[in-house]
Each structure stands twice: as C-alpha cells, then as structure tokens.
A protein has these predicted regions:
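Non-heme Fe(II) oxygenase metal-center motifs and adjacent flexible, charged/small-residue loops
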Residues: 1-262
Length: 262
C-alpha cells in the first residue's frame, strides 16, 4: 500500500486518506477565502451564455454545455490546467457527463492567481511522496443542499498511472461526503466506508486504484450552506486547439441532425 499520510487518516484498509486542515496546514490557504475569491473574481456563464475559450469562468449547471443527457447539473464548475491551451492543447479528462462543448472553458491555471500557490504547494507535496504532479484542476461550488454530485468513480481513461485524485473542500461550510465500495454481484449498493460532514480545508486523497474500487459523492441534503471543492489530477491526454475546432464542428452538426430528425 502507498504511504501518503499518517495511518490514522486512512479509510479502512484502502489507499484513501481523509486529512483535516490540509488546505490550511499544507497549502497555506484559507478555504473560505479561496472560495470567496474564486466566486467573486470571474464571470459566470448561465443558460444561453457563450463560453469564452481558454479563460477563467464559472459554467453553471443550466448552461447547455454542461448538461448531462439533456439535464441540468446541480452545481457550477471551473476548469484549469497547466499550460496555455492555445500553445499546449486542452487537457482532456473524461469525467462523468463530459461533453466536448465544455472543454473550451478550460484555462491555464496561471490566469487564476488565487490558485497558483495552491497548485505549487500541492505539487511540491505530491512530488515529495513520489507521485506525479497534478496538471488538471476542477473547481466546483454547491450553493445549497440541493446542489450535489452523485455517487461515481472517476473515469481512468486519461488519468496517468500513479496519479493521485485529491479533493480539497473549500468554502465556509462543511458538507457531507460519502464513500462506498463497489457493489458485489447481486447487490445494488456497496458497503459504506464513510458518510460524514467534512469541514472546509479537509482533503480526500486516493490512488487511482482505490478510486476504481469505490464510489464517492456529495449527496443532496435538506439544509446546507454554500461550499465547494478543488479537485487535482494528473492527466495524460491533450487536444490541440485546431483538433478541438474539428471535434466541436462534428459535435454540433450531430446535435443539429438529431434535432432535425426529431
């Protein structure tokens, strides 16, 4: 097994660690201030709004580019990567519900000065433990208890072997976080490993292998204050600016055909 942190933070016998005050103690950042700055310093794209390519921006769940199977998502997101997309291509992570239409929203993290020291300190921490440095970062906000993310495992398709998957809880309020094993044959749900409120600044860190053996999520609750997260991964796949133009043209042509046929 890996040795990422003190054994007291390990969840059961899995390579998953829940570390309190990680943002404050390791990254040197106040999770409430970080979320506040990210919420207030960048534009928001809602229903009908056009995404500005390769610039920091919030894309809310009602924006068509973020719809999953035609439905709005109950959360808003920002995407960042290491390197300018126009020069180095867009880092492509196949998260659940991913669509080509939202890839242009990915910005070089250097354009978000609030995140730069977070990424630098995290990558130093990861390197010291023999893990790859992260190059892809998703920021999420949950405005209330209705905002949530369902139980899922991160898709491994473009995640580098050896990558850690690190969730850092941000904002002023804690929020329940659930971890469970994959269900055994004949079962609908797996055994629950953890289901508790994680205070701001807490990190959930897992190996790719542990991710594939489990599911995690932020369940909907009746009452919750605003909260958020930053998720860091190491991704191997990139799509060039020109290639994305081609893929988007095909994507929108296909959508138009489906509408015309309907």
């Amino acid at each position: 097994m890996s040795s990422i942190a003190d054994e007291k933070y390990r969840i059961a016998d899995h390579d998953i660690w829940v570390i309190p005050n990680f943002a404050q103690d390791v990254l040197g950042v106040d999770p409430a201030v970080l979320q506040h700055e990210l919420e207030n310093n960048y534009p928001v794209r809602r229903r009908g709004d056009v995404i500005e390519r390769a610039r920091p921006q919030w894309v809310e769940g009602d924006n068509e580019a973020l719809h999953y199977r035609g439905r709005e998502l109950k959360r808003g997101k920002m995407w960042f990567q290491s390197g300018e997309p126009q020069m180095e291509g867009f880092v492509k992570y196949y998260y659940t519900g991913w669509q080509r239409a939202v890839l242009p929203a990915t910005s070089d993290v250097a354009r978000a000065p609030e995140l730069v020291p977070v990424v630098e300190k995290y990558n130093t921490w990861a390197s010291e433990r023999g893990n790859p440095t992260a190059n892809h970062f998703i920021v999420t906000h949950y405005v209330d208890g209705e905002h949530n993310i369902g139980m899922h495992s991160d898709k491994p398709k473009s995640i580098r072997p050896g990558s850690l998957i690190t969730v850092i809880k941000t904002g002023e309020h804690g929020r329940p976080f659930r971890l469970e094993l994959l269900p055994k044959e004949g079962e609908k749900t797996g055994a629950v490993l953890m289901d508790r409120v994680l205070p701001p600044g807490t990190a959930v860190i897992m190996t790719l292998e542990a991710n594939l053996a489990t599911k995690h999520g932020v369940p909907a609750v009746s009452h919750a204050g605003p909260s958020g997260s930053v998720v860091l991964r190491t991704i191997d796949e990139r799509v060039s600016w020109a290639q994305l133009d081609t893929e988007l043209a095909k994507f929108y042509a296909s959508k138009k055909r489906k509408v015309d046929e309907y």
